[in-house]
Curated annotation (Swiss-Prot):
Keywords: Mitochondrion, Protein biosynthesis, Transit peptide. Necessary for protein synthesis in mitochondria. Functions as a ribosome recycling factor in mitochondria. Belongs to the RRF family. GO terms for biological process: mitochondrial translation. This is Ribosome-recycling factor, mitochondrial. The keyword Transit peptide applies. GO terms for cellular component: mitochondrion. InterPro entries: Ribosome_recyc_fac, Ribosome_recyc_fac_dom, RRF_sf. Its main location: mitochondrion. It comes from the Eukaryota. It is found in: Mitochondrion. GO terms for molecular function: ribosomal large subunit binding. The keyword Mitochondrion applies.
Length: 233
């Protein structure tokens, strides 16, 4: 009997020490009730609180990466090497099947026609595209066309800044799974499902809010830099 008490006491002390070393939170599992039978006891998950902040930061980093790429793509505006890809030629072929387009610096496009016999058809397709672009023959290569791009106007710059702002709002707060607001709300739902509502939970919630605020600031800073670039500042 003495040995049994000693064993129980030792086990209890070890369990208590483990809890002090690694703080945990409790999360309810849904109870199950069989037909005509008693309700089963609720099971409890032991959750390490740090996983919520880790999850938040990981998803925020991914969103920030996507946001940065979308801002960059949007900032290019009409300077897009794929601008002609879906144009149709007189013979019914698609532009991208007959030629390729690359950026040549910031002020022009370079079109390389695969078959020199199709150069006239390519020129006609570009002129008919309604984009107000005029291809010029490259003197040193009869299969290449240089297309000067018109300089952006004050109006076009302002419109592009509005588009950048739309991208910012999408990643700041929208139903998109990649928006910071959506990710934050999902993590908060998980925190609210915890059974243990004490100071440890409050601290985690405060940390989540701080991290969210920091990442919104990062979005805002990238937007300001993109707007300055567009406005030529």
């Amino acid at each position: 009997m003495l040995a049994l008490r000693t064993s129980v006491g030792l086990t209890k002390n070890l369990f208590t020490r483990r809890l002090h070393i690694s703080p945990v939170l409790l999360k309810k599992k849904p109870s199950h009730k069989g037909k005509g039978g008693p309700v089963e006891d609720e099971e409890i998950d032991i959750v390490n609180p740090s996983i919520y902040v880790d999850e938040l930061v990981s998803k925020f980093d991914k969103s920030l990466e996507l946001y940065s790429k979308e801002l960059t793509d949007k900032r290019k505006g009409s300077v897009n090497a794929n601008i002609f890809d879906n144009l149709s030629l007189k013979n019914g072929a698609l532009f991208k099947e007959m030629a390729s387009t690359t950026l040549k610096g910031k002020g022009s496009l370079l079109v390389t026609v695969f078959d020199p016999n199709e150069v006239k058809n390519i020129v006609s397709a570009i002129l008919a595209s309604g984009q107000n672009l005029n291809p010029e023959r490259v003197p040193t290569n009869n299969q290449q066309l240089k297309i000067p791009l018109p300089p952006p106007t004050a109006e076009s710059r302002q419109n592009l800044c509005k588009e950048l702002k739309t991208v910012f709002e999408k990643y700041k707060q929208s139903p998109s799974k990649n928006s910071l607001g959506h990710i934050r709300n999902e993590v908060m739902k998980k925190l609210k499902s915890l059974q243990k509502k004490d100071e440890s939970v409050k601290k985690i919630i405060q940390n989540v809010e701080k991290v969210h605020k920091d990442y919104v600031t990062k979005l805002s800073e990238q937007l300001k830099q993109a707007e300055k670039s567009v406005m030529g500042q």
